């Protein structure tokens, strides 16, 4: 009856419960009991319910002193729970809490401040600073605002569920829950400053930063997880970022890996960047396991890549979590040095492959300064969309080199002698789209053919020849020797 009606209304809503072990109250004047007074009490298992987004408190054991200006609580309790239903689905449960919390009030608000607490949970300990401003009504001059900071050391990454608000956009919250199934927090800090408005509101901020070790980064279901030796995690209202100097994907060692999640109003973009200096075969093996590169599988699975020299590779994968397929954007850059590559399609192997290869989702494969050796002869390689001969081309390439007749016969496994010898310039065009096309062209200058006219020719004479292959069940090879002959041959082993 001594309190104002509004205070009584709030007190009733809070539903305080517990045991008052001892109480001492001193009043200066009985006719003005709230003017000057002092109180000392000891409470056990004190509990209050959540009220208008104000946290609920369960299981407080504390000694309290108070007067008309404010109060101080010395807390030493077991099995404590902090209930914040507008932020966390489950209460924050602590097996013990030790610390102090001060309070003061004015006509239209209560201020809990200078809270310094040491808490222990099942899997971690935390040092906590806590303050909250609680208005008594919507018309109060004081907005609802909480200031919470918690630091932890040596804890499993699973404790993030105790700190990361479920009010994050659902895809981002779900990603964070599944992205870090394994790992250890070496040290971390969590901050909340502001009220409890919709997530990302400009009047409030939530931030988390941690040093992690032994992390498994399951960044996308169905993709190979990355294992990060040491990493840093940062999370705020619109971004989740992780960095690692060293890691591993499949059997491939990674360096300078960065994963970023940007939460926008209409999209949630995941961006993965990494580098590697692995061997060529390790690079291709790892890339083959990425669903993001499924469009490139026909090319990668045709090739057997080897070599012992380090291959510098950078990869950038970007997509919208809300719409992965149409938004997927992949960039891969590979700097090859003295690699070997064998094509099952062409039944051909190249050595000393060096230069820069690129793959882009929109344009397919490209190259810069790529050279190799075929038949122990230098080959110039050009790869890029400008060479495409069909829509939706994945890879369009041109190979220019010199070949001896004996090399070609050996390549095709022809054991019987032919009336031709010499060396000629050859251009091979390869186009991989919904169908695969191979065109081999030469003017045969440098090759002599010891046959009667019109088939015979001298070394210096030009006699354009084109041999084409298409991935269809009939007519594997089509031969056009312009002005001399044409043929269709079926050689299944060629394809």
Segment roles from a protein language model:
Residues 87, 114-116, 129-130, 229, ...:
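Short beta-alpha junctions and helix-cap segments that line functional grooves
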Residues 1-51, 64, 70, 74-122, ...:
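Extended amphipathic, helix-rich lipid-handling scaffolds
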Residues 57, 94-96, 110, 224-227, ...:
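Short solvent-exposed loop/turn micro-motifs enriched in small/polar/acidic residues
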């Amino acid at each position: 009856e001594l309190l104002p009606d509004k205070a009584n209304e709030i007190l009733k809503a809070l539903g305080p419960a517990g045991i008052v072990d001892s109480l001492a109250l001193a009043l200066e004047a009985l006719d003005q009991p709230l003017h000057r007074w002092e109180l000392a009490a000891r409470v056990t298992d004190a509990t209050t319910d959540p009220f208008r987004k104000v946290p609920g408190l369960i299981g407080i054991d504390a000694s309290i002193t108070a007067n008309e200006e404010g109060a101080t609580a010395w807390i030493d309790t077991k099995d404590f729970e902090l209930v914040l239903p507008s932020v966390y689905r489950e209460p924050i449960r602590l097996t013990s809490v030790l610390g102090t919390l001060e309070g003061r009030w004015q006509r239209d608000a209560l201020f809990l401040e200078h809270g310094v607490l040491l808490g222990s949970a099942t899997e971690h300990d935390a040092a906590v600073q806590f303050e909250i401003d609680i208005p008594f009504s919507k018309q109060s001059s004081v907005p609802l605002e909480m200031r919470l900071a918690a630091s932890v050391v040596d804890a499993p990454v699973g404790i993030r569920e105790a700190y990361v608000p479920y009010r994050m956009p659902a895809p981002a919250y779900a990603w964070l829950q599944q992205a870090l199934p394994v790992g250890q927090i070496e040290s971390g800090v969590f901050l909340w400053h502001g009220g409890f408005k919709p997530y990302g509101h400009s009047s409030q901020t939530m931030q988390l930063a941690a040093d992690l070790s032994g992390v498994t980064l399951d960044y996308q279901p169905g993709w190979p997880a990355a294992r990060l030796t040491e990493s840093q995690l940062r999370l705020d209202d619109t971004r989740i970022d992780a960095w690692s100097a060293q890691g591993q994907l499949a059997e491939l060692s990674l360096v300078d890996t960065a994963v970023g999640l940007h939460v926008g109003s209409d999209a949630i973009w995941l961006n993965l960047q990494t580098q590697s200096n692995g061997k060529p075969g390790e690079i291709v093996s790892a890339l083959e396991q990425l669903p993001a590169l499924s469009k490139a599988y026909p090319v990668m699975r045709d090739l057997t890549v080897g070599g012992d020299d380090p291959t510098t590779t950078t990869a950038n994968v970007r997509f919208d979590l809300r719409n992965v397929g149409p938004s997927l954007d992949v960039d891969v850059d590979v700097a090859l040095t003295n690699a070997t590559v064998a094509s099952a399609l062409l039944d051909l192997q190249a050595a000393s492959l060096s230069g820069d290869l690129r793959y882009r989702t929109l344009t397919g494969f490209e190259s810069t300064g790529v050279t190799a050796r075929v038949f122990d002869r230098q080959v110039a390689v050009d790869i890029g969309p400008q060479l495409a001969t069909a829509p939706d081309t994945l890879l369009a390439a041109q190979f220019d080199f010199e070949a001896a007749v004996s090399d070609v016969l050996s390549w095709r496994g022809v054991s019987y002698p032919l009336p031709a010898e010499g060396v000629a310039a050859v251009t091979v065009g390869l186009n991989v789209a919904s169908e695969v096309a191979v065109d081999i062209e030469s003017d045969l200058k440098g090759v002599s053919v010891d046959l009667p006219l019109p088939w015979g020719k001298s070394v210096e004479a030009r006699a354009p020849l084109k041999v084409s292959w298409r991935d269809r069940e009939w007519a594997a090879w089509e031969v056009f020797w312009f002005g001399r002959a044409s043929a269709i041959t079926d050689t299944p082993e060629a394809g």
